[in-house]
UniProtKB/Swiss-Prot annotation:
Thermal behaviour (record text): Optimum temperature is 38 degrees Celsius.
Entry's Gene Ontology molecular function annotations: arylacetonitrilase activity
Active-site residues per Swiss-Prot or TrEMBL entry: E45, K126, C167
Keyword flag Hydrolase: yes
Record protein name field: Arylacetonitrilase
CDD domains per UniProt: nitrilases_CHs
Organism lineage: Eukaryota, Fungi, Dikarya, Ascomycota, Pezizomycotina
Alphabetical UniProt keywords: Hydrolase
Class in the EC hierarchy, top level: hydrolase
Amino acid sequence: MATTIKVAVTQAEPIWLDLQASIQKAVSLVHEAASNGAKIVAFSETWAPGYPGWCWARPVDPALNTKYAYNSLTANSPEMEQLQQAAKEDSIAVVIGFSERSSSGSLYIGQAIISPQGEVALQRRKLKPTHMERTIFGDGSGPDLNCVAELDFGSELGSIKVGTLNCWEHAQPLLKFHEIQQGVVIHIAMWPPIDPYPGVEFPGLWSMTADGCQNLSQTFAVESGAFVLHCTAVCNESGIEAMDTRNGMVFREPGGGHSCVIGPDGRRLTQPLADKPSAEGIVYADLDLTRVVTNKSFQDIVGHYSRPDLLWLSYDKEKKDAAVHRN
C-alpha cells in the first residue's frame, strides 16, 4: 500500500459576500487541485462567503451583517451539494470553511470534511468565536468536539484520519488534545487572511499576525505528530472595499495569504507562493505518512508520552439545545 499522498492548500480570495459565486470558485479550485494529482484540497476559515473582517473595524454593521446572513450556507443546501459533486467527480477530499446559517437564523463558523466519495463525513462549528467574531457568530455545542473523520482513499492509500480546527481553536489546549486523541494524521488548520508582523511597535497582538498564527499551526504539528495544512485566504482591494476595512484592525491593505504545509515535527515543508501575500494560487506537497509513525515513536501525547493516571481529559459531546422537552 502506498504511503505518500499529494495534498493541495488553497491561497485564494473568495467572491466577497456572494455565496453562489464563492462556491463556484471553490469548485473550480477543487477541479484544479485534482487535475494536478491532489487527493485532499483545503480551504480557509469561512472561505464562503469570506471572513467578515468588518467586525474588527467597528462595533456593529447591521447592513453588512444582514447581507452576510443571506449569503451564508445552510445544511443540505444546493451549494453544499455542488461541493459534494465536485469531490465525487474528482475523487478528492474537500475540507472547507464557511459561514453556516442555522434554521433559526443564527450564524456559526462552520467546517465540512467531504469524502472522495462525495459524502459529508464531518460538519462542525467553531466552539467559541474569537473576540469580535462573537458580534456575528454563535457558539458550537457538544457534537462539534468531533473534528476528525476517517476517509477512504481507495485500495492504493486506504483510510486516513483527517481533522480540522478553526483559527484560534489552535490556542485551546484541551480542544487540541481532544482532536489528537481522535487519531488525526492530516490536520487542516483554517485561518482567515492574516497580516504580516510589522515590528515591535505594532500595537496589536503578535499572535494575530501571520508569524503568530503559523507558530500555532506548527505547535499543533509538534504536539500531534500530524501533518498540518496551514490554510489562509487572500483579501485584496475588492475585499477591503466590500467590507470597508481600510481603517480597521485587519484587512487594511491587500494581502493575507500565507498558506503552507507543515511536517509532523513542526518544520515548514513548502515555500511561499510568491513574494507578495496578495498572490492567489495553490500550494502542493507530497506527504510521506511514514513520518507520522516516526514522530509518534518519539512523542505520542495520548499514548506512551502521557500520564493518564495523573492527568486526563473529560468531555461532554451532548448537544445543548435552547428548548428541551422534559416528561
